[in-house]
Amino acid sequence: MTSRASSTTAAPLPENMAKPRTVLVLGANGFLGRHIVSALMAQGHSVIAGVRKLPASSHPDITYIETDFTKGLAPQDWLPVLEGVDVVINAVGLLREHDGQTFDTLHEQAPAALFRACQQSQVGLVIQISALGADEAAASAYHLSKKAADDVLRTLDIPAFILQPSLVFGPDGSSARLFTMLASMPVLPLPGGGCQLLQPVHIHDLTALVQALTPLNPAGTITIAVAGPQALTLREYTDLLRRQMGLGPLRAFSLHRILAKLAAQAGQWMSSSLLTPETLAMLERSNTADIEDMRFFLGRDPTPVASFINPAEADGWRALALLGWLQPLLRFSIAVVWIVTGLVSLGLYPVEESYALLAEVGLEGTAASVALYGAALLDIGFGIATLWLRKRRLLWQMQIAVILGYTLILSWFIPAFWLHPFGPLLKNLPMVALIYLLMTLERQHGLSRR
């Protein structure tokens, strides 16, 4: 929904003031912040990028400063940062609480302190990036915390825009990666059949809106819903993304809500999962908005979902989307091979025959037992580590080394295995290739997260 302050008109700056401004963008290293910074730079503004940790390499035309929202909880903490700043844009946000970062601190306390400091410093304009759904009907901790900061800003005597974006689609956005990945799956289970309503907006429309608002001087606070031109069901959204990636129509089935809730509970324990009980509840809310105000300030209609993916970029989107679920599937498969191999060696396969094979490579007695059970435990350890380790480069290297070691030993002592109809040695070749592929993908595309 869209709400406005008592004054609903935005007056442009006088002609002699319509010039580049000094803009502080907080959360500048996040998805929204990065794109906002680029858009403002293209417009000729002087940008100060507020980041939690200074980057190792920086843009020569951007001033970087450390701004930690977990510590800036009082207005006086922000006053030095605001010296010489004309516009403040708060793009800090998180979808899940983690590592000491909470909704209460990052979405409510720190922004409230920042906004009060902006009033004291007489900052010319504040743009708060909130969220669609941060309204009177808000129920989730995420939306309630966003609404609390918005409400503080509305009480202050300072020109401000509160932007409430819907689901934002962009090439490096986590939600875009998630939904394109889901859309690329051969068959997609959708909670309740995917009837939930979404109104996704493209990142380029959000940044274009910020560009249009930055030179303005509104009287009071104006709240603008930022969404796409039409509401779509979850099923329609994923189907459109799939077709734009050149994968044909979506094949989906209805996932019972009980199973969806169980999956969300499981996702709660996975640090990188976007599916949690709270995000599932937010999805079920079916959040949509009237975008009349957005059209007014943007001067055009926002981009429809059917045009989100540039045809020239469809191949790249498709490859990354497929890797999104194929990579963890490959990793799970390799983990199963290691674990099952270890369990087989522990006794599922006749121990006497295992000892007979070890005798062929010159191991008998105690040495054979140590080799058999030691290798079995190593295999199981490899499998568990494959599933749970976050940084796996060394693990992949160790696995390749062990497989090559097994292969060389057996090739020397039992070369007939190369001609065995079940291919016990030949199968090592694709195994090594897959492990190397995963190691390369994780290094080049950052796919190492669980």
Residue ranges and their predicted role:
Residues 13-14, 213-275, 289-327:
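Mid/C-terminal beta-alpha module of Rossmann-like enzyme folds, strongest
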Residues 22-43:
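N-terminal Rossmann NAD(P)H-binding glycine-rich loop of SDR-like oxidoreductase domains
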Residues 26, 50, 91-92, 126-131, ...:
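SDR active-site strand-loop-helix element
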Residues 56, 62-113, 117, 132-136:
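NAD(P)H-binding glycine-rich loop region in Rossmannoid oxidoreductase-like domains
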Residues 113, 174-175, 193-215, 222-225:
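Substrate-positioning beta->alpha
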Residues 151-172, 181:
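Conserved beta-loop-beta element that borders a ligand/cofactor-binding pocket
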Residues 276-349, 366-450:
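Extended, low-polarity transmembrane helix blocks
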Residues 348-366:
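Membrane-interface interhelical connector segments
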